[in-house]
A protein has these predicted regions:
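Substrate-binding/active-site clefts of carbohydrate-active enzymes
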Residues: 1-71
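A structural detector for beta-sheet-dominated domains
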Residues: 228-230, 306
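Active-site beta-strand/loop architecture of penicillin-binding DD-peptidases
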Residues: 225
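Conserved alpha/beta catalytic core and glycan-binding cleft of carbohydrate-active enzymes
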Residues: 43-45, 57-221, 250, 256-304
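A short, structured beta-strand-centered segment in the mid-to-C-terminal lobe
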Residues: 20-21, 25-28, 230-241
């Protein structure tokens, strides 16, 4: 045998993503070993597995599994083994699934025919909310359904709400940059309301660095955060708001105990599209919290919450 230049570990695929041959023992050993090395030597707390679709599905009109379907059974089997291995050898280690793969029970235990991941990124929530934020007052009314859409599938998985680098870095505008249609102080006020909504919404929170104090320009690869903005009161106040919301979250079990339970969340008002106001309850065994968020630039001294 000799090396002829052909791929040993991955399939030849289109695009810039190499699809590993997950059924091969040497491939599994290579990937498992890399994960353990990163965890043990660099003390990482978890990994986000991106482009899950490439591992779980064959590309259109290419391979088929032994049953004639498009599912990559070797890929699914590998991900299950990965979760079992990680949770056994690396206590507390987090596996977070990302990508648009339509695969059920990603965060269900392997014994229940799931993939065994801890969380899945709710990219639909992020895309919808960024679209909503970027619209003017009339556009927000048209997109009002984005505020409640995630509830249609919220309890099918354990979700992370990913306002991450994927949507907010380099070529993508920051949260502040998406609000360019508003005067500066109104942008700050809208972000305070948005941060409050995300904090109270079911799902774990992921906010890309710099957004918490209102970065104006996207963070470039190899660049650094523009901490000089904290010399300005409005940016310091936004950072203080983010800090206060994090503390409030930790102090109130209603904001996290019922993330995966339909009893932990109830909409009281998800029909005030003209006012761009949404109202809901978060529940826990020890408390109930009433949450009202006004995304408009209008003050409502009297408002029917129900």
């Amino acid at each position: 045998d000799y090396f002829d230049g052909s791929t040993l570990y991955e399939e030849n695929g289109s695009g810039d993503t190499a699809v590993f041959r997950f059924g091969r023992a040497e491939v599994q050993s290579f990937l498992f070993s890399n994960l353990c090395f990163l965890a043990n030597e660099f003390h990482i707390d978890g990994v986000r597995v991106i482009d899950m679709a490439s591992a779980l599905w064959y590309r259109a009109n290419e391979n088929r599994n032994c049953y004639g379907g498009g599912e990559n059974l070797d890929g699914a089997s590998f991900l299950r083994r990965l979760s079992l291995m990680a949770h056994k050898k690396l206590p507390g280690f987090l596996l977070i699934a990302d990508g648009s793969a339509e695969w059920p029970r990603t965060t269900e235990p392997v014994k229940n025919d799931g993939l065994g991941f801890d969380f899945r990124c709710n990219q639909g929530f992020a895309d919808g909310m960024l679209s909503y934020l970027g619209a003017d007052e009339a556009g927000k009314s048209e997109r009002y359904g984005e505020l409640s859409y995630a509830q249609l599938y919220q309890y099918s998985e354990q979700y992370v709400l990913p306002l991450s680098h994927t949507a907010l870095s380099e070529r993508q505008p920051t949260l502040m940059g998406r609000l360019g249609y508003l005067p500066f102080e109104e942008r700050i006020a809208l972000l305070r309301a948005f941060f409050g909504f995300v904090t109270a919404h079911p799902g774990k929170k992921l906010l890309f660095a710099g957004q918490e104090f209102g970065m104006l320009e996207p963070l470039q690869l190899g660049g650094e955060l523009d901490f000089s903005l904290l010399d300005f009161p409005s940016h310091r106040e936004l950072q203080a708001c983010s800090e206060a919301l994090n503390a409030f979250y930790l102090e109130h079990p209603a904001l996290y105990e019922g993330d995966g339970d339909t009893e932990g969340f109830t909409f009281l008002n998800c029909h005030s599209y003209e006012e761009n106001v949404v109202v809901f309850l978060r529940r826990a065994t020890s408390e109930d919290l009433l949450v009202a968020v006004n995304f408009s630039g209008t003050s409502y001294p009297r408002f029917n919450l129900g």
